[in-house]
Every structure is written in structure tokens, then in C-alpha cells.
């Protein structure tokens, strides 16, 4: 049984369906949050502080096969299997809250723990200002055969913000 926080549909805040985006060489692609569940590559979700990354990850963790933890919990856990439990996909929040000595340390520490778990699928969140794209993506590429995908959380528009606050 995982010891990480496991919200249910009843404990997760009702929130507005979010949109994420990523760039290809040709264009910018928008992705509704439900489509995250269909993706199989390593996912890195980026957004500004307070944009709802943690709420989005809590929502993901309500689905069968997903288990949520923070990056710090994963790094300091002696036996990371207790965080994954029976899940197949680890949802890792708040990479930006891990203090590292140099660029890439936090990503390397997370990947080391994922290695102890046999490199399961994962979703990782980080503040965009703290994510070192080239360093982080290269480190993930070295351990995973699928190309990682950076997804940016789209900010609320005025109508969404009003609906969220009501």
C-alpha cells in the first residue's frame, strides 16, 4: 500500500478542465488535460507558481495506476517502492522545491530513484523558471527510450479565473 497522498475524486477540488501546450518544430499544439492520460512518454509539466500544477497532479493521482508524491519525498525515501505501490505511473510534484548544488542535481536524483523502481512511466512537475530544459531533458533521454515531452500549463483566461473563484 503506497504511503504517498492518494486523493479520491471526492477529495480533489472541483476545478476547471485545464489546457496544456507543447511545441513541435512546426507549431504549438494544445492538449486538454484528459489527454495526459493517453500519453506514454515521460511528461514534464511546467507552469508558474500558483498556476495549479499540484491540483492537476492530484487529479491525475485519482486514476487507477497512478501514484503521487513530491520530488523531495521520492529522493529521501529509503525504499521508493513504498511510494509507487501497485501503480505503474509515478506522479512527481514540485521538482523546483528540491535544493540542488548545481544545475541538474534534482533531476539526476529523481532519475536515480526511478532507476531503483525499474524506470516506470512518470509525470513530473516543476516551475518553469526553475526547469533547466536542455539539462533535464537530456538526463531523461539517457534513461528512457521515449522522448520526454514538456507540457506547459496554460494560464486561466478571465472567465476561467472568475469561475474558479466562485
Regions inferred by a protein language model and the residue ranges of each:
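P-loop NTPase signaling cores
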Residues: 1-166
Amino acid at each position: 500500500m503506497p504511503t504517498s497522498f492518494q486523493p479520491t475524486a471526492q477529495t480533489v477540488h472541483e476545478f476547471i478542465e485545464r489546457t496544456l501546450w507543447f511545441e513541435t518544430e512546426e507549431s504549438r499544439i494544445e492538449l486538454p488535460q484528459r489527454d495526459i492520460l493517453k500519453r506514454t512518454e515521460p511528461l514534464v509539466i511546467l507552469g508558474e507558481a500558483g498556476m495549479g500544477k499540484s491540483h492537476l497532479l492530484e487529479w491525475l493521482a485519482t486514476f487507477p495506476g497512478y501514484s503521487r508524491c513530491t520530488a523531495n519525498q521520492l529522493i529521501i525515501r529509503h525504499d521508493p517502492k513504498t511510494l509507487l505501490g501497485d501503480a505503474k505511473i509515478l506522479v512527481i510534484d514540485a521538482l523546483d522545491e528540491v535544493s540542488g548544488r548545481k544545475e541538474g542535481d534534482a533531476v539526476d536524483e529523481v532519475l536515480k530513484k526511478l532507476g531503483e523502481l525499474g524506470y516506470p512511466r512518470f509525470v513530473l512537475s516543476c516551475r518553469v523558471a526553475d526547469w533547466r530544459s536542455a539539462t533535464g531533458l537530456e538526463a531523461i533521454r539517457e534513461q528512457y527510450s521515449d522522448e520526454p515531452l514538456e507540457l506547459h500549463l496554460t494560464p486561466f483566461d478571465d472567465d476561467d479565473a472568475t469561475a474558479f473563484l466562485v
